[in-house]
Amino acid sequence: MKDVAHLVFLYTMKLITITGPSGAGKDTVARMLSETGGYQVLCSYTTRPKREGEIDGVEHCFVESCNVPRDKMLAYTQYGGYEYWTTIDQVKDKAIYVIDEDGLKALCEKFQDIELFKICVTAWETTRLSRGVSQDRIDRDKQRKLLPLAFYDAVIFNNGTLSELRDEVQRVRYMIV
């Protein structure tokens, strides 16, 4: 019986995914979208070390190793030599998931019945550098396998002010059914 309930849950799940390079504003967009609309922001597990200013359980759940079976994962990816994943059990109903492109492709292939709204957040390299992203991280991002912009339901170019970003997020919010 649990399996049937689980399948029904997956079929009715609504998920907003957000991808983009380091420093583009993915987490900021996720927070803005979650403020209204009843969406929870999923906290990915990761084996990477915590960065300065990050809070365990907010940006990520920091762990030493991954011991979750793959069939219990919503998505899994490796990036920069570290593992990132989210479990299916973390999703209650409507959720926002900040994920990389490989993870998004795998999610789309694994769960074809999930209602997805895919957002790409991007910013110029100079903007990202001004936000404190290192040149090494920018260079690493250049090695990512990018998805064509047409793959996404919405693209946010985050090169302006916080107020301009709020306006863009509001525009996207109207697109989410």
Regions found by a protein language model. Name each.
Residues 24:
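ATP-binding Walker
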Residues 96-99, 113-132:
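Conserved phosphate-donor/acceptor-positioning beta-strand/loop module used by diverse small-molecule
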Residues 18:
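Hydrophobic anchor at the beta1->P-loop junction of P-loop NTPases
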Residues 27:
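Walker A/P-loop
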Residues 35-42:
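Post-Walker A helix-loop "phosphate-sensing" segment adjacent to the P-loop in P-loop NTPases
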Residues 44-103:
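ATP-dependent small-molecule kinase phosphotransfer cores
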Residues 131-176:
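Small-molecule kinase domains that catalyze NTP-dependent phosphoryl transfer to phosphate-bearing small molecules
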Residues 21:
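P-loop (Walker A) phosphate-binding loop of NTP-binding proteins
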